[in-house]
Design a protein with these regions (language model features):
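Active-site neighborhood of divalent metal-dependent phosphoester bond hydrolases
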Residues: 84-88, 93-121
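Cap/insert and terminal regions of metallo-dependent hydrolase folds
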Residues: 179-301
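Active-site-proximal loop/helix segment associated with metal-binding centers of metalloenzymes
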Residues: 16, 129-221, 227
């Protein structure tokens, strides 16, 4: 089974709140680890979950408000002290490179590993990163500083070989058959690919919408996403405050999920004024029942499917 799993490390907003850390998440795609935002205390949360820092391949920073990146410098330094040698790429707003350089210079630190900052795109749908596991595209969010969400979409898998037909396929042709080729036998008989293979699982998708005002223009990009994380800083009682600060209410997050036909909605970035997430959760579930309030230290698995589910 190929893993596609989200670990929530922090669910709080800007001000400290008992029991909540600032925003950070870890996405595991086929055992490759991608860190999404890095608020204060991220290292501690990673340690609690038994995550080896050195396995983190890339870091994605949505914007430069402190609750989303102030844990980054400590993590970079810890990787240095732990002997990291493999390159680390950080996708982030342009000013982050200068911030990191100033802090490294002030502490007299010369990293043992290559560190590269790649600037986030401005437009939704623009490519951020592609590897053999996942394709990442940008989501243009609406906030007080340049802010980018991220859509992680699994790369398509090959077709599977039918157990009752695999014996007729020569070893050297099996990869081609998995890619969709028909099989021609020695006597000239052509076996259609559909008789030899099973449909591959559908590519899975996770969307991360951090700090943003209500942005229905995101819906086309989010269409059919399996798991949507959307900030829900306030309830509708404070909709005016949400507009002023360019944040979202739980109801607005749920509306985005409903219109996008998302599989599940995960709420986060809870204001410290809410001692419990229940008011936010109840507000969202009234619009989109498949809503959960993100729990720190909890893993959310997106299972493989071979057909589209009608919710």
């Amino acid at each position: 089974m190929r893993r596609f799993e989200l670990l929530t490390l922090g669910t709080g907003a800007a001000l400290p709140a008992r029991g909540r850390y600032p925003t950070a998440q870890l996405l595991n795609v086929h055992d490759a680890l991608y860190l999404i935002d890095c608020g204060e205390g991220t290292q501690e949360r990673l340690r609690e979950q038994g995550v080896n820092f050195l396995r983190i391949e890339r870091i994605f920073i949505s914007h430069l408000h402190g609750d989303h990146y102030l844990g980054l410098q400590g993590l970079i330094s810890s990787m240095h002290l732990m002997g990291r040698r493999t390159p680390l790429v950080i996708h982030a707003p342009q000013p982050l490179k200068g911030i990191i350089d100033i802090q490294l210079h002030a502490s007299g630190t010369y990293l043992r590993y290559p560190l590269q900052v790649q600037v986030n795109p401005d437009r939704s749908g623009d490519p951020v990163h592609t590897d053999d596991r996942v394709q990442v595209t940008a989501l243009a969010l609406k906030h007080r500083v340049p802010t980018t969400g991220f859509l992680f979409r699994e790369r398509p898998a090959s077709r599977g070989l039918r157990h009752d037909r695999v014996a007729v396929i020569p070893h050297y042709l099996r990869d081609k058959v998995k890619q969709g080729a028909d099989l021609t036998l020695a006597d000239g008989t052509v076996l259609p690919n559909e008789e030899l293979t099973l449909p591959p699982p559908l590519p899975r998708a996770y969307a991360y919408c951090s700090d943003t005002a209500y942005a229905p223009e995101l819906v086309p990009q989010l269409q059919g996403v399996d798991l949507l994380y959307h900030e829900a800083t306030f309830t509708e009682q404070l909709a005016g405050r949400a507009r002023e600060t360019l944040h979202s209410t739980a109801a607005q997050a749920a509306t985005i999920a409903r219109e996008a036909g998302a599989g599940r909605l995960l709420l986060g970035h809870f204001s410290s004024r809410y001692k419990s997430e229940q008011p936010l959760l109840q507000e969202a579930q009234a619009i989109f029942p498949r809503t959960e309030a993100a729990r720190e230290g909890h893993r959310y698995t997106i299972v493989e499917r071979t057909h589209v589910e009608n919710f």
